[in-house]
Every structure is written in C-alpha cells, then in structure tokens.
Amino acid sequence: MKRFAVLLVLSLLFQCELFAQNTVNSFQKYPVFPNCENESIDGLELCFNNTVRELIYNNFEEPAIVSEENYKGPLNIFFEVDREGAIKLLYVDAVYTELKDEVARVFDQFPKIEPATYNGNPTYTQYTVNLTVPLGEFVAETEAPVEEETTTGSGNDLIGNEINPEYDALEKNVYENEEYRSAINIPLSHHNYSLFDPAMNQVGTNSHTAQKPFLYSEVNKYYNFEEQQASILTNKTSWFGRKFWDQHMVTIKGKDYWITLDPGVDLQVGRDFDTDVDTYNNTRLVYTQGGIGKKINFFAVVYESQGRFADYFNRYAIERRPDGGNAGIIPGRGIAKLFRSDSFDYPIATGHVSYTPSEHFNLQLGHGKNFIGDGYRSLLLSDNASPYPYFRLNTTFWKIKYTNTWMSLRDVRSEVTADGSFRTKYMANHYLSYNITKRLNIGLFESVIWENDNDRGFDVNYLNPVIFFRAIEFSTGSRGGNALIGLSAKYKFTNRVNAYAQLIIDEFSSSDIFGGEGSYKNKTGYQLGAKYYDAFGVKGLYLQGEYNRVRPFTYSHNTVVLNYGHNNQSMAHTLGTNFSEFIAIARYQYRRIFGDVKVIVAKRGFEFNTPEDSFFYGGSIYGTEDNRIADLGNELAQGNTTDFFHAEVQGGYLINPATNLKVYASVIFRDFQPMVDTEVNFANQTTWLNFGVRTDLFNWYNDF
C-alpha cells in the first residue's frame, strides 16, 4: 500500500512536470553540468537530461539478484538539485533493496554543479528519472521530451520536477511599523492612553477623544508613535537583544500585506497579607496583527490563564458565578472553572477585523470591549465587563464623529438559563461627538437593550443608525426594550488643562427627575472630572481628578434581563449603582520608567439580603424594581451604607515598547466598612502586594 502511494505521487509529479518541461521560463535556466557550460539556454534542458542519464548508466553496477531472478521492471528515482548545486537523492522506488542501495552509491558520485536560477537567483529544483531494469546501453536523446510525446522502447526517461518559483518570487520587505498607520485598535490601557492624551487634547485640534478604543491612524496624526519609540530604543545589535527590548518577535511584510506575531505573558506573584493568602496569575498569550491591502486590518489575541487573587477579588468572582457549575467570573475577563481546588482557570480570546473603505468610514467586527468617555470611569459605556461580540461603525467628517455599536450580550443567571444555554440579549449604542469650537466638545448618547423573547432574535428595527431610538422602543412594545440616554462634554482651558463631564438618564421621566421627592424613577448619574498634563512643569506628569455619582436603581430594570449588564457585570461603572465616588490619579513616565498612584474614596449602598430585610434598595443592577423599598424618599447610598477606600501604587519598567511588555510591582490597600455585616458584605481590609511581568493589552480593574 505504501509503495502504491509513492508510485501515485511520482506518477502525479511525472504528469505535472512533463507539461512544465515545455516552459523553461518557469525557472528560466536549468542546472548546468561542466560539460554543458557552452550550451545555449534552450539546449541546457537536453544536456542536463542526457548527462544525468549517462552518469547513471556508466556507473550503475547491476546487483546479482536481478540476473539471478531474471527480473525486469521499473526503477524510479526522485532527486533534487539545491540552491548550492548539490545533487541529493530523495527516494528510490524499486523491488529490491539492492537496487536502492546501488542507486544511492551512484548518486554519491555525482559532482556539484551550477544550480537552476530564477530571475538570476539560485533556486531549488526536483527531478524524476524513470528507468527500466536491466538498463541496457545508454543512448543519448536528440531533443527534449514534449508534452504530447509517448514513451516507447526502454522507457528510460528523465522528467524535470522543478519547484514552482512563485514561492521564491514573493516580496520580502522590511517591516516599517505599519501598525502605527493602520486602522487597528490601540489596546485599552489607561496608562498607555495617558501618554498620547495630551497630544489629542491640544486647543484647536479637531480630534474626538471619547470614543475608544482609538485607531492607531487616528492618534498618529497628533502623536508620532515612531518618533517616541525611536527615542527610547536600546539599539541592541544581536537578534535576541532587538526582539526582546525593541521589536516584535516575528514581522512579515510583502507587497500588499504585513503581519506581526508575538508571544506574551501576564505573570503575577503576590500576597494578601490580611488573609495570609499567596496570590498568582499565570497567563500565556499569543497575539497577531496585520494588514491586507490598504483597507483591511486585523488583530487577534488568545489567552490561557490560571490565577488566585486577593480574598476580596476571589469573593467578587465567586459571587458572580454563572449558572451551570462554573467557579466564577473573573472581573473584566470571563467565565472561570475551578483549578486545583482554590484557583480559577479562565481562557479567553479577543480580536477584530477592521475595514476602512474611505477616510470617513471605519467598520469593525470583533470580540472585545468599547469605552465612551474622557474619564477613568464611564457612566455611558466602559470596559468593565467581559469581552463580547460587537459590530461598530465609525463615521468621521467635518467636526463630527458618529459611532454606532451593536453588541451581543449574555445574562448568565440561573433564573434565565434554559437547557444549559445562557440568555442572549442585545445592545445598540449611538454616540455623536461634535466639536462646537476649538475648545468645546459635546456628545449625545443613546443605548437600548432588548432580549431574544418570542424568538425575536436581533431586532432589525435597531439597525437604524440615526440617533434616538425612543420612538422605535415604543413601536416594538412598551416592554420591548430598555433605553438610556446621555450627554457628555469636554472643555479645553489650555493645552495642559481640560475638564470633562457625563450625564446618564435611565428611563427618562422629567417629573420624577426634577420632582425632588426621591422617586425610584429618578435613575440618573453624573460625572465631573479634570486633567492636568505636564503638571507643575514636570514633563510626563499626568494628574486627574474625577467625581462620579449614580442614584439607586440606575441601570436596573423591572425585567432584570434588560438591565445594563453582561456576564453579571456592569456595562458602565465598575461600582454599578447607588454610590458616590471621588478618584485622584497621578501617572508619570520617563523614558521606560513609569509609575501610577490612584486613590478612591466612595460611599456605596447595598441590599441587606436577610430574612428580616429582603427589599431591593437599588444597590445592584441585577435587582428587580418590583421588590423596591419605596416609590419615594430614595436617597443616595441607601440600604446597607458602606464606606469604601482604595489606594493603589504601581511602579515599573517598560521592557519592550513594541509589545508593551512591562515588569512592575504594585501594592493595594483596600478598606470596606458596611453599616451592617452580612454574608456578602462585611467589614474587611486588604493589603495586597504584587510583582509581575505583563504584556499590557487590557485594563485590570481591582478597585471595587
């Protein structure tokens, strides 16, 4: 059977290459034996064939077994001429081992010759010699075989099996940081975004900074990535030095395409001193990005992770575990299964394909996250929850940038799980950013959530890209969806100072919002913040202050599946709802050294969830308003009022700016003091020390 397969392959090669013999231009010039050096190009094929056959005939010594058994039959030889001109035997198909050994002996005596060439460059070629044993006497051919020729006589023919030169003809160009001019998303990282935030917010620029992630091509107009990277190059000369400190591991560039490929890690070791728990995270990843033509770009990353975190983090993950027996949901990452009885295993993959038909449009299909706002937090849409499938359309012209995003989300609670499948729901967002003046920008936001009820699936009514869905919601039924609207604004006082704001209104009811009676329908929130670049004249020092305030019941819904959540996490603010929060942030980077300091002070309200008090106080986006504590008199942080403090310091070194590989150390101090200790919310403090090496491709949120 094996011999049959080989014969079949050789037969196919014979048939294919017999045709190729008529087109010498496929490798332009045959290999040249010394005795063929004076032949014309057209005569080299015949001279090569005759010389190979003559060397075989003149040196071949017939094994005794051939005459003893009066054997007559085929002897097929497959060989190559490499780029250095060495002739190497690849395979012999013969009935006797002695025949194979004799052919090998003969080919060992073949001289080194001038290799075949294509476009003047040496190229690799293969050939098949079909002989019949006994060989008889050598008779030179007088012309090269042609396609129509039928073998007669002894059948001792040599057929050129040259490799198609198309592979060698592929252009191999030098990678020139094409990613910085591409329509690939810049990975969401608060520290990395702070590096080019000053350039994007110069007075007089027509940039739009709320819709994130940014495309490299958007930012590159204001911030020269190549220049910045060149300023911190280590100029290592060895291959390993360049790849480790300055460059992507693998780069490929051709005529109309480019690709980079990199391994990565997120390795952490630490300790939660208050519970005496050793923590770790072991993430291995590989990511690739590239471009095909001028209009298509892509990015993809695959993570394989195991981890055990500080006690408060682990409890948070377990509390949000999905139906079906999985151990938890890692905040911002995804569903995790149990690993070694006390840890989590949470694989994940993200990526996107980006299509830019013109300078005014960009379309993306991906699995990842989006963010709307200029702050550390967002009340409109943040990257707090797990990645999700999305389709996004960005339209940019004049002083306007208009973003439409359609998302597929999941409700993983046991109450809505059917036959082991999580409940699917959909979200459609519109955000219109308008630069009114060279200093002032305003944004209009709208979002609607609907579920797959009555086999409704993805409701095409929400494909309408024109902002405000409210009329559509009523046309599909009063309980057909949950709509939110919002506003944002930013004002640039100087090139170094700007202020920003957001307002979210969930289920707008003017009488309840402005009535002043604390209606549960007053579901609003706002954000105020400011940034100061190169603060106090220190280049690279970035200061930010932010205040967030969200009333109880905001983002929730009487039909819980229609809330503003995904995978048991908020799609907006990390703290969910029913809180006030002040954040102070300082960031600094000098060349490759960086540091971050963050302090958060908040007042939060939770449910008691006890037999004596099971009312819904509006402290969770997954509560049902049908069980609300009161229609009126609802106050901020009501219920189990909790004082929350979080401080975090991180310092590190950027190992490789091309891949965002960093080494760092961090310490977190967290203080959580509820008014009443319950099973879920009880007084605790955490001091969490961490050391790590990380490829920085997403934001970790530990501040909840």
Model-identified regions with their sequence ranges:
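Generic short beta-strand segments
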Residues: 111-112, 263-269, 667-670
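A solvent-exposed, charged loop/short amphipathic helix patch at secondary-structure junctions
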Residues: 28, 318-331, 617-632
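A mature extracytoplasmic/lumenal domain signature
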Residues: 79, 91-94, 129, 135, ...
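Exposed, low-structure sequence patches enriched in small/polar residues
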Residues: 3, 346, 440-704
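Bacterial N-terminal signal peptides
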Residues: 7-15
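Charge-biased low-complexity segments
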Residues: 6-7, 20-154
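Residue-level preference for beta-strand/loop junctions
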Residues: 71-73, 123-125, 280, 345, ...
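Outer-membrane beta-barrel channel domains
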Residues: 161-441, 447-452, 515-524, 531, ...
